[in-house]
Amino acid sequence: MSGNTYGKLFTVTTAGESHGPALVAIVDGCPPGLEISLADLQHDLDRRKPGTSRHTTQRQEADEVEILSGVFEGRTTGCSIGLLIRNTDQKSKDYSAIKDLFRPAHADYTYHHKYGIRDYRGGGRSSARETAMRVAAGAIAKKFLATQGITVRGYMSQLGPIEIPFKTWESVEQNAFFSPDPDKVPELEAYMDQLRRDQDSVGAKITVVAEGVMPGLGEPIFDRLDAELAHALMSINAVKGVEIGAGFASVAQRGTEHRDELTPEGFLSNNAGGILGGISSGQPIVAHLALKPTSSITTPGRSIDVDGNPVDVITKGRHDPCVGIRATPIAEAMMAIALMDHLLRHRAQNADVQVNTPVLGQR
């Protein structure tokens, strides 16, 4: 199956299914000499892993990553980095009743038509379980970007109808929702408790921000940085929309409001989300992701079986009532991977480019 590799100079290839023996990633193109440890990777994996609160799937996976190659005495060698996470808490029997049915709004129907065979256990390859390897690979990218003064951070900005204003980065890591507003957490918990009683699911919005990105990243025309970020972020399970900067709000803006004016002291706004003409401007890069409600719920839904007969489908098993709750580390990982790839591509072509114009920040 193609489409398992992302990137051009810094590439990430993943393999594995939700209920298979393990998940695997091959990370290629990382420069040699980068200090890296299991703890660097495990930190973000622990932020993403299931079973950490009552508001996520109760599947218990330690998600302990193993580094198989490409690292020697705590430093990258420049060779391919092999990563592995073993699956330890599969309950495949939960899915035996739906092996010949198609769950509404799930990938069952489309995988069946594309390949003629599918792993029905937990969604197989289409499961968000695969994103554990992206997070592990993304931790390598984040470590490299940090050596260049670049940080990538994210937070939940909306859960269902509840909008979450940004207050502090410190709050993000202090609750299960990655909420930047601690005062919103009780409301989010109450909403999720009621959602569970209703046997339903809900969507979410995640915001991810990269700071310290130098001007010049992005390869027009078809590899514009915003196009590449949209590609990377849209590849995450359940993501149905991506905005860069003001995004769809720019439809209602006038040019006098939307344009990010420049002064010697810096840009006056950042409606462009840190990208102009497909190239980073030096401002913070800001992206927003819309994640749909998970389709795996216990409320019956109409569908068909493999023979086309009408059926009612009830999905058993352990599922996230809101996949957005664990999506923040995944979004950070994909943005970091995309930025590292473009940073290396920029170096390859433009390392000797020098201009006298100062780099502007945001006032």
Curated annotation (Swiss-Prot):
The keyword Flavoprotein applies. It comes from the Bacteria. Its EC number is 4.2.3.5. One of its GO terms (biological process) is amino acid biosynthetic process. Signal peptide: none annotated. GO terms for cellular component: cytosol. Keywords: Amino-acid biosynthesis, Aromatic amino acid biosynthesis, FAD, Flavoprotein, FMN, Lyase, NADP. Pfam families: Chorismate_synt. It catalyses: 5-O-(1-carboxyvinyl)-3-phosphoshikimate = chorismate + phosphate. SUPFAM superfamilies: Chorismate synthase, AroC (SSF103263). CDD domains: Chorismate_synthase. Its cofactor is FMNH2. InterPro entries: Chorismate_synth (IPR000453), Chorismate_synth_AroC_sf (IPR035904), Chorismate_synthase_CS (IPR020541). Pathway: Metabolic intermediate biosynthesis; chorismate biosynthesis; chorismate from D-erythrose 4-phosphate and phosphoenolpyruvate: step 7/7. PROSITE patterns: CHORISMATE_SYNTHASE_1 (PS00787), CHORISMATE_SYNTHASE_2 (PS00788), CHORISMATE_SYNTHASE_3 (PS00789). Belongs to the chorismate synthase family. PANTHER family: CHORISMATE SYNTHASE. Homotetramer. This reaction introduces a second double bond into the aromatic ring system. This is Chorismate synthase.
